[in-house]
């Protein structure tokens, strides 16, 4: 084994610390209080802003504090169709309009929502990426649970008291535009994380990576490794159940169609 490899130098394990420099703030729903549980609050969208490192724009919404004579500023993930000067209503008595926040149990089946709470009062955890949305499928009034279809296609049963914003997250189609230049990729990943550019192991020297070296770029041995492999050797396909192309599936059918063409 040669030098300390890249996977060892990272050293933080599975703990991810988000880059917060230049960020505008953490966009969340309002704290769940008495006003939202029994009525509604009215807010005004003051500004639509860009948050570095985030694909979706943010909406700066000013609410009048229900308990004190002051305004409270809140950052929301902007839904598609929101605009400056729009009135936003939060609470169980709010109307079904884009940008409004209300419990999913009060929404009709088929409603498109975003920034959905996973647990009641957690201020939004699901369907927050640009262009993403979840849809309300069915309600069970006996158990006070609601069935929701998530952006991944998975169906999840959540408490009907969980809140969500009506609409689709703005910024959809962002990944359709090609990056084209390495300079753009540099600026993109600089604010998101520090893993770019990522050099392939086979392009390194043998002291820098287990896959490095050779007269041409090849791994030279099986790329699968055990789960308990020591850190300097634990690269490649870790504890793989199987390798190679999946035959007989959707991917294989697409490959055969390309061959025919």
Curated annotation (Swiss-Prot):
The answer to whether UniProt assigns keyword Nucleotide-binding to this entry is no
Q: Which Pfam families does the annotation name?
A: Ribosomal_L2, Ribosomal_L2_C
The cross-references to Gene3D superfamilies, in alphabetical order and at most eight, read: 2.30.30.30, Nucleic acid-binding proteins (2.40.50.140), Ribosomal protein L2, domain 3 (4.10.950.10)
Q: Which GO terms describe its cellular component?
A: cytosolic large ribosomal subunit
Disordered: annotated span: 208-233
Molecular function terms, GO-annotated: RNA binding; rRNA binding; structural constituent of ribosome
Q: Chief localization class?
A: cytoplasm
For biological process, the GO terms are: cytoplasmic translation
Provide this UniProt record's keywords sorted from A to Z: Cytoplasm, Ribonucleoprotein, Ribosomal protein, RNA-binding, rRNA-binding
Q: Where in the cell is it found?
A: Cytoplasm
Q: Which InterPro entries match?
A: NA-bd_OB-fold, Rib_uL2_dom2, Ribosomal_uL2, Ribosomal_uL2_arc_euk, Ribosomal_uL2_C, Ribosomal_uL2_CS, Ribosomal_uL2_dom3, Ribosomal_uL2_RNA-bd_dom
Keyword 4Fe-4S carried by entry:
no
Q: Which domain of life is it from?
A: Eukaryota
SUPFAM superfamilies associated with the record: Nucleic acid-binding proteins, Translation proteins SH3-like domain
* Family that this chain belongs to: Belongs to the universal ribosomal protein uL2 family.
Which NCBIfam families does the protein's record reference?
PRK09612.1 (NF007180)
Name the record gives this protein: Large ribosomal subunit protein uL2
The gene that this protein is the product of is: RpL8
């Amino acid at each position: 084994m040669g030098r300390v490899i890249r996977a060892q130098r990272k050293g933080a394990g599975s703990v991810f610390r988000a880059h917060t420099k230049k960020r505008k703030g953490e966009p969340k729903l309002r704290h769940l209080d008495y006003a939202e549980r029994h009525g509604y609050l009215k807010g005004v969208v003051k500004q639509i802003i860009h948050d570095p490192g985030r694909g979706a724009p943010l909406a700066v919404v000013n609410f009048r504090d229900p308990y004190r004579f002051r305004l409270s500023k809140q950052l929301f993930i902007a839904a598609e169709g929101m605009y400056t000067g729009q009135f936003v209503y939060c609470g169980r008595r709010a109307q079904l309009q884009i940008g409004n926040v209300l419990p999913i149990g009060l929404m009709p089946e088929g409603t498109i929502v975003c920034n959905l709470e996973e647990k009641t009062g957690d201020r939004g955890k699901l369907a927050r990426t640009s262009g993403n949305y979840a849809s309300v499928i069915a309600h069970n009034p006996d158990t006070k649970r609601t069935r929701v279809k998530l952006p991944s296609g998975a169906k999840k049963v959540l408490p009907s008291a969980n809140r969500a914003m009506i609409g689709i997250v703005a910024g959809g189609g962002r990944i359709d535009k090609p990056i084209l230049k390495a300079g753009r990729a540099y600026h993109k990943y600089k604010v998101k994380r520090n893993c770019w550019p990522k050099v392939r192991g086979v392009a390194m020297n043998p002291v820098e990576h287990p896959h490095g070296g050779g007269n041409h770029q090849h791994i030279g041995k099986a790329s699968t490794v055990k789960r308990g492999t020591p850190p300097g050797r634990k690269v490649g396909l870790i504890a793989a159940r199987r390798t190679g192309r999946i035959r007989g599936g959707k991917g294989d059918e697409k490959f055969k169609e390309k061959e025919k063409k």
